[in-house]
């Protein structure tokens, strides 16, 4: 098919997706997690050290905030949210950040941050919030087990993720808002653990967040883009990062069928441009196996093993199916 016809078809597809999302969004948002009230969290000082006393104090402060949010959710009549928050407040769980408002913002630590030589920060994509947090938690725990001793994983839900079917999922708006917070968070981790190797693992729309933050990520060694619809950048050089950029996609991931183009409208651009696993993008490709969109950190999967190898600073095994 001639290039101009193919591009025209991609533009029509994006416009159709935007119209469909605009119609569906009011329906899908009717029982939004953001509707559950929560108290304003107590201010926290920037993390400057990862010694046991500092971290224990931080974990205790966020636990108090979680319990307060749970009580407010119970008074609101949301028993499911209240129960979930009681579970998050258990002493065995450790949060560097917590804000229960507007769907939730959290940063949960898996592993011992005081001794971590490798730190992986998971940046999730669409439809991740306090009511659907279990998947991010399970993925983080699986990666921590795969990495073994000397590693910590942080599940960073530091922004309001878009709904999968919504206009916000087709633009960089939410990512632009999230990027400064991600930059500050990685800077704090580096200050607290200056010798640790930090990697960002960016799933789906999370890869757009990582891309928008990339120029300011001074302390990050690796950016891993997986299940990515694109980044909003035309290639790796446009990310303006010193980090090594990796990209992988499972063979059963539906995101492969997303139009990899960007359509500029008068007041907004929709779509995220070139496919990060394409050779022309310039990322280092890794074999992400045969899984689907939510399977990358599934225990025993090739994608989990290769992502863990990248976090550890070693080369992934196998040959990318998109090379």
Model-identified regions with their sequence ranges:
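Gly/Ala-rich beta-loop-alpha elbow adjacent to hydrolase catalytic centers
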Residues: 201-210
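Mixed-charge, polar/low-complexity N-terminal
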Residues: 95, 204-205, 220, 227
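Flexible, membrane-associating and regulatory peripheral segments of lipid-active enzymes
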Residues: 1-135, 310-323
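Short hydrophobic segments within beta-strands
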Residues: 122-123, 201, 248
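Structural motif
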Residues: 118-120, 197-199, 222
